[in-house]
Amino acid sequence: MSEPPVIGVLPLTPARFPDLATLFEEGGDPKWCWCTYFRSRGRDWSNSTAAGNRAELKALAKRDLAPGLVAYRDDRAVGWVSLAPREDYERLATSKILAPLDDVPVWSIVCFVVSRRSRRQGVAATLLDAAIEYAREHGATTLEAYPVEVPKGERIPAANAYHGTLTMFERAGFTVVERRQWNATSPVHPIVRLDL
């Protein structure tokens, strides 16, 4: 039986950080990463710890511009999306696949986390809609993301879908602006944009 729909999506603040911590501590990559991977460069990331990553995200929650949005159902955090102006994500500047396409000032969506009990219930799509509105309200003119393309009829592990799926972004009005890959044998990664 599925859970009721998400009832609210709110910016991360220090007061909401314990709710997000409960979600992230369910396990998997969020428990270690704390959604800081794209905010650091290689060497800094290699030297990071789960406690340090948690402290970094907690500090980011104190900013006027939230580092992401939290989805709630019945006062429980069930989802997260990380979004910010692209320059906040240091790793994007040095990535071969995700390097800037041009000089357009974009905001980037880099990560989704959805509670195990709430997956396949529209939580990520609800977060995406809220992210579009949040970016628009804060002056963004273009939103960019780096989703995974799932072949029709196939499923992928949740751990591989943390960027969101291409179909979800296309349903929200995003279009593929480029496809990149490391080399001829690596997977192709779409880059999508939405003009706000």
Protein language model features and the residues they cover:
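Conserved acyl-donor/pantetheine-binding loop and adjacent beta-alpha core of acyl/acetyltransferases
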Residues: 63, 72, 76-113, 117-119, ...
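Conserved acetyl-CoA-binding loop-helix of GNAT-fold acetyltransferases
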Residues: 109-114, 120-137
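Conserved N-terminal entry element of GNAT/NAT acetyltransferase domains
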Residues: 1-39
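A short helix-loop-beta-strand connector motif used in the catalytic cores of GNAT acetyltransferases and
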Residues: 45, 50-70, 87-91, 108, ...
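Conserved GNAT-fold acetyl-CoA-binding loop/helix
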Residues: 29-55
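C-terminal "cap" of GNAT-fold acetyltransferases
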Residues: 160-172, 178-196
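Conserved GNAT acetyl-CoA-binding A-motif
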Residues: 128, 135-160
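Short, well-ordered beta-strand micro-motif
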Residues: 70-72, 82, 191-195
